[in-house]
Design a protein with these regions (language model features):
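Flexible, processing/modification-adjacent segments and terminal tails
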Residues: 35, 44-47, 93-146
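N-terminal leader/targeting segments and the immediate start of mature chains
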Residues: 16-63, 186
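An acidic-aromatic
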Residues: 63-118, 174
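Well-ordered beta-strand positions in beta-sheet-rich domains
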Residues: 56-60, 81-83, 152-154, 177-179
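Gly/Pro-enriched, hydrophobic low-complexity segments
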Residues: 131-186
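Sec-dependent bacterial lipoprotein signal peptides
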Residues: 1-15
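Solvent-exposed loop/turn segments connecting transmembrane beta-strands
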Residues: 50-54, 76-80, 147, 173-175
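Short, solvent-exposed coil/turn segments at beta-strand boundaries
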Residues: 36-39, 61-69, 85-90, 134-135, ...
């Protein structure tokens, strides 16, 4: 009788391990859609927190099938019109008599203007650590690489699996926030 009871307990434990995490499946489906897309477009509002000061700006973004992101700064008016491209190998800015002067974050690992590119790169290839419900949204936590000094990104997606908000954390501290609007995968 003890053996049967032990066997039943083991079966219950093993049955619990076989359950599927639907939120992880949704996160992986979003990744697959991004990897298979020819392009993606979205608007971002970015807030960079330096502790003693905060910078905010808005960008229109378009990515290609390789994850390269072209952008145009739309707000504030003082830097509107600056364009650029960010890729794995680096980036370029184009402007007339205006310069983006944002100090680097995360021990010189991250420029705030690269936040949209990092959002897509992380969704496409980062180390997915968790996914679960957060109110009406799903929260996905992803590290940008498998190293100890990885940036962590918490991304909230709506019911249609479109990113709507993200936080970039460095050593557990929120350094950048991103609001995402009009996210479209083509």
């Amino acid at each position: 009788m003890k053996r049967i009871g032990l066997l039943l307990c083991m079966l219950l434990v093993l049955a619990g391990c076989g359950g599927k995490n639907r939120d992880l499946e949704r996160a992986m489906a979003l990744r697959s859609r991004l990897l298979g897309a020819s392009e993606c477009s979205f608007r971002t509002g970015i807030t960079a927190d330096y502790g003693d000061r905060v910078h905010t700006f808005t960008m229109e973004n378009q990515s290609d099938q390789n994850g390269n992101v072209s952008f145009t700064v739309s707000e504030p008016e003082s830097i509107a019109g600056i364009t650029g491209v960010i890729r794995d190998s680096g980036g370029e800015l184009t402007f007339d008599d205006t310069a983006l002067a944002f100090p680097m974050l995360a021990d010189d690992h991250l420029a705030p203007v690269s936040a949209p590119w990092l959002l897509l790169k992380t969704l496409r290839s980062g180390y997915l650590t968790s996914a679960g419900k957060d109110g009406d949204l799903m929260r996905i936590t992803i590290d940008d690489r498998y190293e100890d000094d990885a940036l962590t990104m918490d991304i909230w997606v709506d019911r249609e699996d479109r990113p709507v908000y993200a936080e970039i954390l460095w050593k557990g501290e929120n350094i950048l926030t991103i609001t995402v609007e009009n996210f479209q995968i083509v």
